[in-house]
Amino acid sequence: MEAGSIIRIAMTTAGIAVMLCSFWFLSVKKMTADFAVIWEILGVLLLMIGAVPGLSGWTQNLFARGEQLVICIGAAGVFFCYLFSLLLSRLLMKNHELAIEVSMLLREKGADHQEQKRRESVWQETVEQPRKELLIILPVRNEEKNIGKVLEQLCCPEILETADILCINDASSDGSEEIIDGYPCVQIVNVYGLGYGSALQLGYKYAVRNKYQYVIQMDADGQHDVCNIPMIYRKLKASDTDGECPDIVLASRFMEGSSRFPVSAVKRFAFWLFRTMIHMVTGRKIADPTTGLQGLGSRAFSYYAQYNNFDHQYPDADMVMQMLLLNYRLTEVPAVMHARTEGKSMHSGLEPVSYMLRMCLSVPAVVFRIKVLRRR
């Protein structure tokens, strides 16, 4: 066999192996989606080297000049980098879980003096009131231009009669924390660079430990109108014809009765892609699988609160797919939402492209993990 053919076969085999291994480790939650995307891209490059004559010819020239040692060292380097990425992924996952527990412990022990003062004043005023069953969770990161308006609407008698409000402040470097401190009825937990998904999971753990029955999660940027809260809450408590209440209520931007919401071409394609994937696998038509405005019953958020059951980066369509495949009851309601007017979105710049790559790997990985691995 010619040297060129051997090189093409080797590169193609290596590319396929890298892609399959990365998908496998992502499916069994041994590798983060970020690392998996990087290795999948490398696998595609190796496949291209094996398939494109010009690239494989260039590789053959390296061998012809007696540089096999360099190639072997490169292969060994890739192998050890792969092992390192697996180890680092594991450490990152454990670190997020540990950081969440530490943040919860610090709050429970009253390490933050301002938080301790707020807790004392609030509980003195509410000690005679019946325990509330709803917790509203708001992850906050650098939202000083928006969070005050959102809390002003949330801290009204109609909402506070039935709900407690929890803000998870994720290392905000602006005045977000000071603004939240101005609302004594709002509980706050400070975390440090854990990301959106981990902030939500901390909220779920808080809800479990404080025995809430329902959770509504919403963004702190003003896009999710507070008028949606009562409707989602009622839907969570409403039983269907079988007498069962939904585990998850998705507030949709794209159902009949929803307010008109501007969406870019990239996001429209992403929504279509994820809707199609969910429909093909589960048979369910979900109008808005990436909505951040959701209501959850105790069965759902108790599951999310457990280690490795929730995406700590961008929990979106992959979590919807997961819960449908696990037979959780899910429904949608039309919602009123607004375009962001101030501040910077976490999906700005090239982030939507990176987000799509992660989701395009995470969603199939969820399907493989539940439909294939769990049956063994």
Where are the model-predicted features located?
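Acceptor/aglycone-binding surface of glycosyltransferases and processive sugar-polymer synthases
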Residues: 190-209, 214-216, 226-313, 340-350, ...
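A conserved acidic beta->alpha catalytic loop
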Residues: 169-177, 222
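Hydrophobic transmembrane alpha-helical segments in integral membrane proteins
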Residues: 1-15
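N-terminal signal-anchor/start-transfer transmembrane helix
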Residues: 11-28
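Donor nucleotide-sugar binding loop of glycosyltransferases
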Residues: 143-146, 172, 225
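Short beta-strand/loop segment that forms part of the nucleotide-sugar
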Residues: 138, 162-172
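Short, well-formed alpha-helical segments that are part of the catalytic scaffolds
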Residues: 143-157
